[in-house]
């Protein structure tokens, strides 16, 4: 047990007295407090020590979960068959299709208590696009999402084909400039027309979405279809991720004598401890909690337990490599030295091997192994770069940076990405940015995000927040978007506003 009444009272009081939280945000935070205070299964002394030192991290899930962290329902099944639990028939009109989605989303849980995957909405709506009121209905739908799912981890997918619905969504989002929902274009240059892709680039420059996912590579990952959920997590549709925990490489490196000690001793030990913890959480979720026994999503086949995996996240590669190089008296730095980059690859190869040595009772869709994930960070991270990104302030020239991404992105089956803001003049050359994306993807890059230096909506690490909302929070004024508070602290701690702005 980890219950301390005095600390518990302080934590509750800090929530209920905060003027920067809405009622719903306060309610959700209060509901999470007990799960962070009580253990439901035994953890090892070694695991607890590594957590207390900040080398391992539970990722705000608490010590137990009662629903999967990321859920990607089969929305096509919903449109084919309807839903008995929610008394929804298969939609026959665009109005019914949108209403069906709006109702269904309300009942899809996640770690944030909001849906993190909205489906390939363009494909879902395309059969109904002959409706003469299509523009008004879709515009109203997008406004509904922004106002009723106040969390930009909710993620819509488009493409790879161009559709009337997809074109309209991009047009309206360019106009609305909302932070919610996040959007990804599943991009394949052999399928996606350049004119549609360029419209997506222009939309991104105006409101930081859509991002571009390398569909040609991602579609190879799973036996069935995949989706991009939450930040940029590539996961199976009709499944998702049971849980996500992470290793903080930079903090672990502080304990190392040198790179050999780090790779051969510290890293395997920490990986084993984290894998054991992830497995314990999955077993509790599947075998003891109610979700996989009684939830309608499971009972009606919208998700299946065999399509879920466990995510093994990492952060701080940049700082880890630089610290190990310093300890060995070497001048090379991550991104700027072949020796430093080779060390990073050795770390990833070793970590992948350690994770693959652990056999999970579940995680059928990833051969009973956990999936490596380049985690984007949390709001309390300080001088810890997301995943394998080069630190803000140390960015490479653009083409070299894209090549660097291409070397490291392929290690991460369940998600990785990089962010490249451009100056305002880039809107005159969307074709040039599209060429950069094509080039990066041909080099192995998996996920590309951009926004314009002068737009209000920006990508923090993997999610979207309005700069104007951050300014309000700075004055203690509540804003509707729940994860804007995380963006506020990441701006303070992670130099988000100092990210290198590119020119064409």
Residue ranges and their predicted role:
Residues 2-306, 327, 333-337, 356-504:
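Conserved catalytic cores of very large enzyme subunits
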Residues 331-354:
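Short secondary-structure subsegments characteristic of cysteine-rich extracellular domains
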Residues 267-271, 313-316, 321, 325:
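A conserved active-site cap/scaffold subdomain adjacent to cofactor or substrate pockets
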Residues 116, 304-320:
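Conserved phosphate/anionic-ligand binding catalytic regions in large, soluble enzymes, centered on
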């Amino acid at each position: 047990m980890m219950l301390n009444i005095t600390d518990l009272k302080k934590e509750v009081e800090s929530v209920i007295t905060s003027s920067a939280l809405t009622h719903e945000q306060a309610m959700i935070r209060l509901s999470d407090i007990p799960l962070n205070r009580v253990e439901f299964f035994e953890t090892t002394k070694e695991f607890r020590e590594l957590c207390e030192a900040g080398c391992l991290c539970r990722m705000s899930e608490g010590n137990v979960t009662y629903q999967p962290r990321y859920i990607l329902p089969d929305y096509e099944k919903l449109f084919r068959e309807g839903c008995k639990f929610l008394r929804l028939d298969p939609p026959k009109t665009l109005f019914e299709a949108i209403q069906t989605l709006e109702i269904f989303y309300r009942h899809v849980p996640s770690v944030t208590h909001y849906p993190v995957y909205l489906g390939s909405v363009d494909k879902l709506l395309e059969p109904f696009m002959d409706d003469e009121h299509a523009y008004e209905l879709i515009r109203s739908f997008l406004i509904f999402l922004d106002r009723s799912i106040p969390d930009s981890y909710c993620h819509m997918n488009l493409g790879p084909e161009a559709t009337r619905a997809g074109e309209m969504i991009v047009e309206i989002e360019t106009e609305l400039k909302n932070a919610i929902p996040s959007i990804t274009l599943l991009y394949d240059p052999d399928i996606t027309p350049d004119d549609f892709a360029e419209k997506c680039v222009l939309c991104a420059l105006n409101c930081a979405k859509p991002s571009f996912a390398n569909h040609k590579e991602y579609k190879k990952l799973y036996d069935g279809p995949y989706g991009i959920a939450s930040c940029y997590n590539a996961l199976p549709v009709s499944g998702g991720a049971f849980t996500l925990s992470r290793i903080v490489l930079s903090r672990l490196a502080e304990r190392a004598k040198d790179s050999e000690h780090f790779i051969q001793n510290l890293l395997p030990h920490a990986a084993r401890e984290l894998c054991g913890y992830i497995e314990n959480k999955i077993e509790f979720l599947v075998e003891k909690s109610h979700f996989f026994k009684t939830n309608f999503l499971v009972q009606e086949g919208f998700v299946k337990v065999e399509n879920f995996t466990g995510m093994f996240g990492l952060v701080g590669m940049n700082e880890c490599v630089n610290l190990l190089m310093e300890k060995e008296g070497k001048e090379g730095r991550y991104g700027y030295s072949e020796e430093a980059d080779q060390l990073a690859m050795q770390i990833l190869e070793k970590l992948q091997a350690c994770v693959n040595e652990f056999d999970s009772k579940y995680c059928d869709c990833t051969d009973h192994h956990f999936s490596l994930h380049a985690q984007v960070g949390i709001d309390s991270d300080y001088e810890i770069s997301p995943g394998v990104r080069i630190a803000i302030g140390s960015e490479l020239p653009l083409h070299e940076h894209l090549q660097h991404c291409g070397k490291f992105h392929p290690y991460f089956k369940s998600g990785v990405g990089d962010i490249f803001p451009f100056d305002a003049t880039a809107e005159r050359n969307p074709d040039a940015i599209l060429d950069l994306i094509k080039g990066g993807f041909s080099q192995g890059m998996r996920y590309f995000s951009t926004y314009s230096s002068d737009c209000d909506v920006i990508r923090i690490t993997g999610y979207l927040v309005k700069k104007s909302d951050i300014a309000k929070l700075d004055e203690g004024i509540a804003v509707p978007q729940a994860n804007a508070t995380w963006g506020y602290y990441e701006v303070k701690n992670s130099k988000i506003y100092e990210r290198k702005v590119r020119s064409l």
